[in-house]
Regions:
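Soluble ligand-binding/transfer domains with enclosed cavities or grooves
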Residues: 2-154
Length: 154
C-alpha cells in the first residue's frame, strides 16, 4: 500500500456497500476487540426521516466482540456535500456535526472534540475498492485506537 489514491468526488466514491473489519484497542488496559459487518452509503429515503437533505446515509451493522462477549452493533451517520466534490460534512444521525472530510489527496486527518476527549481520525484511500480509518481517542478516561478497513462489496 504505497501511496494514496486521490478522490475527486467523495460521495460517488463512497456510494454502495462495503465489508467492514475493525480492531479496537484500549491502550491503557490492553483490552482488545473486533467488529465485523457491513456499511452502506445510500441516498436518504425520499419519504422518511432525513428526506429533506442531500448526500448519503451511512449505515453500519455487524457484530462487536469485546472481552469475550459478542453483541450486535450499529451506527448511522450522514455524509453531506462539503465545499467541493472531494469534501463531505459528516454528521451524526441526529444532524449534530461530527467532522469534515476532504479526500482530494487520498488522505485526511479530522478532529472531533467530545467533552474532555479528543477523537482524531486519519482517513486513507488505497484504491477504488479499499480505504481505512484510524481513530485515536484520548482523554482523561479514554486511550483507544480503532482501525477500520473497508472493502467494496457492491
Amino acid at each position: 500500500m504505497a501511496g494514496f489514491r486521490p478522490v475527486d468526488d467523495v460521495l460517488a466514491y463512497l456510494a454502495g456497500g462495503w465489508r467492514v473489519r475493525r480492531s479496537v484497542r484500549d491502550l491503557a488496559s490492553g483490552a482488545a476487540g473486533t467488529f465485523e459487518g457491513t456499511t452502506s452509503f445510500e441516498p436518504p429515503d425520499g419519504d422518511g426521516p432525513g428526506s429533506a437533505w442531500e448526500g448519503l446515509l451511512h449505515h453500519e451493522s455487524g457484530l462487536f466482540e469485546w472481552q469475550g462477549v459478542t453483541r450486535p452493533a450499529e451506527r448511522t451517520l450522514r455524509f453531506l456535500p462539503g465545499g467541493g466534490a472531494s469534501r463531505a460534512d459528516v454528521r451524526f444521525a441526529d444532524g449534530r456535526p461530527f467532522h469534515d472530510l476532504d479526500l482530494a489527496t487520498g488522505r485526511y486527518v479530522a478532529d472531533h472534540p467530545c467533552a474532555a476527549d479528543l477523537y482524531r481520525g486519519e482517513f486513507t484511500v488505497f484504491d477504488a475498492d479499499r480505504w481505512r480509518t484510524v481513530w485515536r481517542v484520548g482523554g482523561p478516561a479514554k486511550d483507544l485506537v480503532l482501525t477500520t478497513d473497508y472493502t467494496r462489496s457492491w
